[in-house]
A protein has these predicted regions:
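Short amphipathic alpha-helix that is part of the acyltransferase structural core
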Residues: 1-70, 77-80, 84, 150-192, ...
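GNAT/GCN5-related N-acetyltransferase fold signature
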Residues: 56, 68, 90, 209, ...
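Conserved acetyl-CoA binding element of GNAT-fold acetyltransferases
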Residues: 79-92, 221-233
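Conserved acetyl-CoA pyrophosphate-binding loop and the N-cap/start of the following alpha-helix
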Residues: 94-106, 116, 234-241
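Conserved GNAT acetyl-CoA-binding A-motif
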Residues: 104, 108-123, 246-257
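Conserved active-site alpha-helix within GNAT-family acetyltransferase domains
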Residues: 116-117, 123-142, 258-275
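Amide-forming acyltransferase catalytic core, primarily the GNAT-like/NAT-type
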Residues: 139-250, 255-260, 286-306
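C-terminal interaction segments
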Residues: 334-382
């Protein structure tokens, strides 16, 4: 008898059944390890995880699922709609039936139709390259240890820096953290009620950072996975205090935080430049404009004057625009001028937003202006 197959949004799917299914596919037992524990922000009942998913069922039984979660990102004065892909799951006995492919294409079509600006995920480059995703979100990663600290901080006065874990959603420190978070030049929207759950994603811990003399100094998510300071000049004091407790550390710094990149580069043992995620862009002109503006704000007087016209054969349609810098001020505008560079979709993602782009190396302006500081903090990943 032919099976009844459904492919579409997960409306009407039982949440407990859904969680059991994705936990099973990922090898979680659902108790000690599972999606509800890893990402309560997404899988609590009030978050409606099934409605944010695409599923395949055979005779009513789940065989495949992917989650698509919408977030708002503030980039300088621009707001972008960023859709994250998560829990891509296919039952072991339902593989090779094209279910993942069908759901991914369905999700991408809906993201484009709904006005998403870009999408991010974690996963293998070639696996998700079939669906237009490419390595992006370049960061500098630094390793710092006690030996570095002993040499670099020996003449620095000691300070009473403390890390206090925050576990109560009503902790008054959270209000300070939210306000500080929203002062950053690049941040994902985190409402007050969900802030703790968001920061504790992936079983990380949230810490308030305090100075014995001055009080609230910032907050840390995980083991330096995210560090937000009220005063960036406190970076060395915070690193020193962290190393005293932990011995060594790794810290990833997005490209917009130039002061921290500079400070970390002076005391680190090793540094690495790499991509932190996979992205696909649906509105290249808009997203390039937002992040080029952010770069000009955080690295003033560093953009050389020039103009470059690009034609992108994007998954959401062709886009042709001119990127120009005049007296250090960037603009990105639609144009019908003949393009200087023609790019396929994934080439364009790497060209503007990736750590490595062979096409970018062929153009002096592109090599000088890009990559742009696109980034999503780990706590905001899905």
């Amino acid at each position: 008898m032919e099976k009844k197959i459904y492919k579409g949004r997960g409306y009407g799917v039982d949440r407990e059944e859904y969680l059991d299914f994705i936990n099973y596919v990922f090898g979680f037992n659902g108790a000690d390890h599972g999606f509800l524990k890893l990402l309560p922000k997404l899988y609590k009942e009030e978050a409606k995880p099934c409605e944010n998913s695409y599923v395949v069922t055979e005779d009513g039984k789940l065989k495949a699922a992917i989650g698509v979660f919408v977030r708002e990102q503030h980039v300088g004065g621009e707001t972008l709609s960023v859709h994250g892909i998560g829990n891509v799951a296919v039952h072991p006995r339902a593989r090779s039936r094209g279910y993942m492919r069908d759901l991914m294409h369905m999700a991408i079509d809906d993201m484009i139709a709904s006005g998403a600006d870009y999408s991010d995920l974690g996963g293998r480059r070639q696996r998700y390259g079939y669906f237009s995703y490419e390595s992006a979100e370049p960061v500098w990663e630094f390793t710092i240890d006690q030996t570095n600290a002993r040499h670099c901080f020996r003449d620095m006065p000691s300070r009473e820096i403390a890390f206090r874990e925050v576990t109560d959603p009503d902790d008054p420190a959270i209000e300070k953290m939210v306000l500080l978070h929203e002062k950053r030049p690049l941040y994902m929207e985190r409402n007050r009620a969900a802030f703790l759950d968001i920061c504790r994603s992936w079983e990380r811990k949230l810490y308030e950072i305090t100075d014995g003399k001055y009080g609230f100094a910032g907050f840390m998510v995980g083991d330096m996975d995210e560090l937000t300071l009220a005063d960036e000049s406190d970076f060395y004091a915070v690193v020193r205090a962290y190393l005293a407790d932990h011995g060594d550390m790794r810290i990833r710094v997005p490209l917009y935080n130039v002061d921290r990149i500079t400070a970390a580069s002076l005391i680190c043992e090793h540094s690495y430049f790499h991509d932190d995620a996979k992205c696909t862009i649906f509105h290249f002109e808009k997203v390039v404009r937002a992040f080029l503006s952010l770069k000009s704000q955080t690295r003033p007087n560093t953009l050389c004057d020039g103009a470059l016209t690009v034609l992108v054969h994007g998954i959401a349609g062709d886009e042709q625009f001119t990127v120009a810098v005049t007296n250090g001020v960037p603009t990105v505008e639609k144009t019908d001028k003949a393009p200087d560079v023609v790019l396929e979709h994934r080439e364009a993602v790497a060209f503007f937003f990736g750590a490595m782009s062979p096409e970018r190396m062929k153009n002096a302006y592109a090599a000088a202006w890009f990559p742009l500081p696109i980034y999503v903090d780990g706590a905001d990943h899905v």
